[in-house]
A protein has these predicted regions:
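Active-site loop immediately N-terminal to the catalytic Tyr-X3-Lys motif
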Residues: 95, 141-148, 169-170, 207, ...
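Short C-terminal tail/terminal secondary-structure segment
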Residues: 141, 231-262
């Protein structure tokens, strides 16, 4: 028996990367998936079927949350799983951030998660469903030049914990995943530079970036009955990056070579 057999699921930002991997994994395990994205070409590349449908939407647009939820109810007559994956990184430094830029990053990284979950709440209450928010390790720790993004993702983590407390008595579970550096089309440009790749290897105990399928595996667990007693949790899937102040011997040696007098 597949873990998600007949269970309707919404996955946002599902045209590529982490969202695509989650949508395909849930569908592989039996879910009826509505894959949502603003990228119509990316959605068209998904292997659509009667149980894997696509919906083009800008999650930050007025009325989009209600439209997304309405489409899932129309297609599949319910919502059992909601995966809020839409996000936007590469924000400007704090001192260069305009109000318009702040709103752009806050809207997609935080407001969309809030509003889509709010729109889906009645259906999730009926189904005793699951919400999974894709946050970031930058919502757990500080990092240079990521103030707006980190603030938004920290807010998603706070929302996750509060919703878990608020709706546990109605049978709804709410968890989050905090991915580290994952090899996706969005990160390919940076990962393909030797310096950035060396830095990731040098600060991650597992010595490599993660794969979207590894986030999807964690997502499938948290959304399934196997995690039936898990709520309000944030699972870092980051190769151990946030578990310690890990620095590889190679990076230590680089520092020594650069400061031979110390």
């Amino acid at each position: 028996m597949k873990r998600f057999a007949g269970r309707p699921a919404i996955v946002t930002a599902a045209a590529s990367g982490i969202g695509r991997a989650i949508a395909l994994r849930l569908h592989e395990e039996g879910a009826q998936v509505l894959a949502v994205d603003i990228d119509d070409e990316g959605l068209a590349a998904l292997p659509r079927s009667e149980t894997l449908r696509t919906f083009v939407a800008d999650v930050t647009a007025e009325g989009a949350p209600q439209a997304i939820v309405g489409e899932c109810l129309r297609r599949f007559d319910g919502i059992r799983v909601l995966v809020n994956n839409a996000g936007l990184g590469n924000c400007p430094p704090f001192h260069e951030t305009t109000e318009a830029e702040y709103r752009k990053y806050a809207d997609i990284n935080q407001k969309a998660t809030f509003m889509i979950t709010l729109a889906a709440l009645p259906a999730l209450t009926r189904s005793k469903g699951v919400v999974l928010n894709i946050a970031s390790t930058l919502g757990l720790v500080g990092y240079r030049r990521q103030a707006v993004y980190s603030m938004a993702k920290a807010g998603v983590i706070g929302l996750t914990r509060n919703l878990a407390a608020d709706y546990a008595d109605q049978g709804i579970r709410v968890n989050a995943i905090a991915p580290g550096i994952i090899a996706t089309p969005q990160t390919a440009g940076r990962l393909n530079t030797a310096r950035f790749h060396a830095t990731i290897v040098g600060t991650t105990p597992m010595g490599r970036p993660g794969r979207p399928e590894e986030i999807a595996g964690a997502a499938a667990f948290l959304c399934s009955d196997d995690a039936g007693f898990v709520t309000g949790q944030v699972l870092a899937v980051d190769g151990g990056q946030t578990s310690s102040a890990y620095i590889s011997e190679a990076l230590v040696q680089c520092w020594v070579d650069a400061h031979p007098d110390r």
